[in-house]
Amino acid sequence: RDLVRSRGLGDVYKRQVITVDDDLIYPRNTVERLLSLSYQYPDTVCGNVIRKIHMDGNSFSVYRKWTKVFTMPVNSSLQNVAIGCGGIYYPPHWYGEELFDWKIISEHCPSADDLWLKANELKRRVKVTGGGEFYPRPIELPQTQNNSLQKKNNGKTNLNDKQWKSLNELWKLDELYCINGK
């Protein structure tokens, strides 16, 4: 189950957490890779699959322009967005109370957990680490992707852009991103 939608996880603040999507079969080394990155880059969120935020001047570009990166030198940056389909490591103490604010979640970002988490990372200036050797895309379980969030968020409805715009208007994420650099 993912971190945001599982209620009652306030006690995870003091713990390391690894999230994976429950509709995928992951490579055997998924957790090992995440832990290895976390040892090298403590106090950062770590992901096996990364997108890079793309800007048009001082504004965020549309989500489809955020490049998905499967292979790159390991780096830690505010530009990196950890994508849940690769598994994500969260260090202890990385988030604030708003992470579990269901009123804000339901109003601004009800179905894009990766973006909700990224917005909270930007607010707290928490970098995301990713990269290294090629990480193969996990195998989709049959019949699980017909109505997946990924299709709704990235498909014709394009909910990712709508939800990111709403979060940006709420918290001025573009200003935080430009001020704090990449």
Kindly give the residue locations of the regions a language model identified.
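C-terminal catalytic/acceptor-binding lobe
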Residues: 103-182
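Short His-Asn-centered micro-motif
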Residues: 20-22, 48-49, 91, 113
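Conserved catalytic core of nucleotide-sugar-dependent glycosyltransferases
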Residues: 27-103
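Single conserved hydrophobic/aromatic residue that forms the stacking wall/gate
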Residues: 2-13
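Short, high-confidence coil segments that cap the C-terminus of an alpha-helix
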Residues: 14, 41-44, 126
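A residue-level structural signature of the nucleotidyltransferase/glycosyltransferase Rossmann-like core
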Residues: 17, 87, 109-110
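Short beta-strand-to-loop acidic/aromatic patch adjacent to the donor-nucleotide binding site
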Residues: 14-25
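Short, hinge-like loop/turn segments at secondary-structure boundaries
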Residues: 11, 62-66, 147-149
